[in-house]
């Protein structure tokens, strides 16, 4: 009996030793990985953490020094010795976030020169100003690189004014955020990017006219002008295929987008529209749509739809569109319905509609009367089935009300879009009372009936928004 217990004890001890050995072997397996794989793993963490792996073993001591991806974050008053230890001949990706003060200006320049000397391909620079002087300027070497393919610059409203001829011959993707760029500087930058394919301008100031007519390879343009002091901008972009334009208080003018095939328009309204701003936005929105001669894919947000509803109320003529795929982002509220209806009617070739339900930020019906017009009174007779923005929040979570609202919207679409082949509706969680079986059964039964009776494929999906 005692011998059997002793034998079982030895077997358990042996299994324990084998388990420990497997763990050790697993650790050794990581150590024996090729450098390329280890470099790839380290590229997903900040460089200061990657440097700490040098204490793991002799094998890891110099691994980080040859990692082709660097992610440097230096805060106020910090110094860094990475430059002296780094040995990789080429940097594929370099991210620099730095707090600027009187002592760190030379460090910013040194890091930029260091990255460019290693033929960096993807460069991201984020400089935050703690001097409050806004006087920092990139060194001339920053504007001269034959290796850069992707550049992302975020400044704290510094001037980005090159004092030399820009030469980014390999650059394909350029993103500029919170920069002050006058027209002549932008012209200099564009002239130095002969193969540029994508341009993003996020909250950049001083730019009044963006002329991309001499950038034949540029296909994607993304402009975000939510900041009030950005000012108006005229866009000349005859070669782009895709445009995303987001703006707030200052409308933009589209001069030429003759090759455009996909557009995404949105207004971020931080205040209720006054009669003056409503008139200005209405004129601008209709002028933009009239420029979209060849647009096949169009995405619009809630404020654009409300402005189009006002235009419909005023009897303003709408342009006829060639849109085949329309995406709208809004709620099922009364103020957007006339705008959606007119978009559908004036898109005779529409094949697909996608709706994403999002919480409405501002409702036109809550503002003061517009030159004697009372939108709520005018729309109530034709859109009474749809609630106002105040009424809809009383309905949220009521499954029966949600079902009727979704059915009303789908019927509205089917009446106004005669060529429609597919409709996709993404319902946010705010429309439900946590009853998933109800969502799957009652709503899906209703959708199946509408789809069959109208010969249109209808999909209803539940989103997390």
From Swiss-Prot:
SMART domains: FBOX
Transmembrane parts of this sequence: none
Assigned keywords, A-Z: Leucine-rich repeat, Repeat
Top-level taxon: Eukaryota
UniProt domain F-box: residue ranges: 27-73
InterPro entries in alphabetical order: F-box-like_dom_sf (IPR036047), F-box_AtFBL13-like (IPR053781), F-box_dom (IPR001810), F-box_plant (IPR044997), LRR_dom_sf (IPR032675), LRR_FXL15/At3g58940/PEG3-like (IPR055411)
LRR repeats: 127-155, 178-203, 207-225, 278-302, 332-357, 402-427, 447-465
PANTHER family registered for this protein in UniProt: OJ000223_09.16 PROTEIN
UniProt-recorded name of the protein: Putative F-box/LRR-repeat protein At3g28410
Organism name: Arabidopsis thaliana (Mouse-ear cress)
